[in-house]
Amino acid sequence: SNSLSSGQVLHCPYEPQKAKLVVREMTDLLVLDLVDKGLVADQMVLTVGYDIENLTDPARRAKYHGAVEKDPYGREIPKQAHGSINLDGHTSSTRKIMCAVSELFDRIVDKNLLVRRMYVVANHVLPEADAPKKNDGAVQLDLFTDYAAEEEKQKAEAAALERERKIQKAALAIKKKYGKNAILKAMNLEEGAT
């Protein structure tokens, strides 16, 4: 199976909320990379490494009762957080992937620990043309579902995804022509953003 990843080691320890902002920035760039290469993924993996200060600071050490591991230098640090989340089929939608990674971050990261390293991975990556399409075949019918409303909802979702794809392509074209900082999002200007 193929994957595309992005990792970052922070210059100083970050509180979890600031680290989440950095993870969101990394995810945004990773999704644009997927779109640029014409790829889609159906699973996201997140690994978050904690800082040594969590165990060297007596106040933080007293609050931490979890597993401990050694870093490459032989120092004790809290065990890294690692998890994955499956997406609803293969996609390169910024909205869907960003929501999934944010949910994953909230689920696996200890909110009391300082963060030092982060890795975001798009897993099971395929060319968009090779991605399995959603099953448009047989559907189990029942008397209580408004199928006209369901169909409208699916059409609206498809239109929203198409609009998002056009925005992604336009952003890529601008960044290629004028440089990677030609377009900034509000999250890129928040304190702690990289």
Residue positions per predicted region:
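Basic, low-complexity intrinsically disordered segments
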Residues: S1-T194
